[in-house]
Amino acid sequence: MKASELREKSVEELNTELLGLLREQFNLRMQHATGQLTQTNQLKLVRRNIARVKTIITSKAGA
């Protein structure tokens, strides 16, 4: 997900997106722990998307 797409969303939409990403991260971690995860790069992508969303939420709260 691109940061420019995230900047267009409201804070409520970003919080919803963040919850979805956190759930996805949890599921990926469980799959990784049980050896079912084949694309381990997904963990990295989700972690970075979480950071993007949190950064934009913080910048909107400060503005």
UniProtKB/Swiss-Prot annotation:
PROSITE patterns: RIBOSOMAL_L29. GO terms for biological process: translation. SUPFAM superfamilies: Ribosomal protein L29 (L29p). GO terms for cellular component: cytosolic large ribosomal subunit. One of its GO terms (molecular function) is structural constituent of ribosome. The keyword Metal-binding does not apply. It comes from the Bacteria. Belongs to the universal ribosomal protein uL29 family. PANTHER family: 60S RIBOSOMAL PROTEIN L35/50S RIBOSOMAL PROTEIN L29, LARGE RIBOSOMAL SUBUNIT PROTEIN UL29C. This is Large ribosomal subunit protein uL29. It comes from Shewanella denitrificans (strain OS217 / ATCC BAA-1090 / DSM 15013). The gene is rpmC.
